[in-house]
Amino acid sequence: MNILTVNLILSTVIFAIVAKLYLIPALPRLELRTVVLPILLLHAMRHLGLMFLAPGAVFPGIPAQFAYPAAFGDLITAVLALIAIVAVVRNSNLARPLVGLFNVVGALDLIDAIALATIYDAAPHMGPAYWIPAFWVPALLVTHYVVFVLLGKRWTGPMCASEQLIVHACNDAYEAISSP
């Protein structure tokens, strides 16, 4: 029995149950940005996938055929999430296609990483980074599903107070890093 596979499946089921019980039923009442911005912010943290390339975060012998695609796939997805955040915050016409691009690339990256970890038996070499596929990947898979659901919904309308707070915080952060 592959313990990582069991962890991955059970964690995914648990996150899916949480989404089914609490998030999916609330979607019709929520503005899209209220849901998509926190998901994009979560995925912006996928730069942590670079840990698969960090000595000490993984054990020696981690298969390069798994580590490099997983690490750089996560990094690319994190960058796409950041780009999509800017588009969503600015209510750009590119928001929907950029969120879609982020979501397809990110979901395919996770599927690829799961397949490569299985094919190349990466689990015994993951060391402290084991928590990424045991916890993060299931949560991220479920949020990708939620974003696919959101992509089929309306993308206009007034912002609620919580959205306005997120948008203002993102705008302030953007201005802080872009001004000399």
Name each model-derived stretch:
Residues 25-36, 90-95:
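Membrane-interface helix-boundary motifs at transmembrane edges
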Residues 73, 77, 81, 98-118, ...:
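Hydrophobic alpha-helical membrane segments
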Residues 157-177:
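Short, highly charged, low-complexity non-transmembrane loops/tails of multi-pass membrane proteins
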